[in-house]
Amino acid sequence: AISKGFKVGVAAFPDGHPASAANPTQDLDVLAQKAKLGASFATTQFFFDVNKWEQLVSALAKKGVNIPVIPGILPITNLKQLNRMADLSGTSIPDSVANRINSVSESDVSKVGIEIATEFSEELLKAGAPGLHFFTMNNSDSTYQIVQNLNIAK
């Protein structure tokens, strides 16, 4: 049992866990088991498709699991870093994102990446996300700009 007032967060994988060969049923069962063992919330690996978050939350609810699932956002500030992180995590980069990033010069990648992350964050919040988790990659400036764009800072 977990002490009263103490919360435990666990990982969730909208694109599938890299070690599970993208077996959504297995990933969902593991996440549901984490919740049944006392997890208070889940934070996802970064991803780029709001439908995947909605499907994950819906599938958990069908299993009777209603913990908050906080989506992970990776502000794209560097193309090389994005590709490396996607390879390591098994996260897919939608054509719509890749096309926008690949259509600009390296010096504009961060600007467009912030636009993409802002739009994605807006979609997630509109879909009911309980909050957002940013993978800052030691670059809090981009996250600060996204929060300003969302007009959620106090």
What is the meaning of each model-derived region?
Residues 34, 38, 71, 132:
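Conserved, mostly hydrophobic/aromatic
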Residues 1-16, 26, 58, 62-114, ...:
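Active-site pocket-lining/capping segments in soluble small-molecule metabolic enzymes
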Residues 27, 31, 53, 113, ...:
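Aromatic/hydrophobic pocket-lining residues that form the small-molecule binding cavity
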Residues 22-37:
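Active-site glycine-rich loop that binds ribose-phosphate moieties when present
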Residues 1-6, 37, 119-131:
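A structural motif corresponding to the C-terminal end of an alpha-helix
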Residues 1, 20-25, 46-62, 139-150:
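Active-site-adjacent beta->alpha loops and helix N-cap segments on the catalytic face
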Residues 40-49, 133-136:
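Catalytic beta/alpha-barrel core
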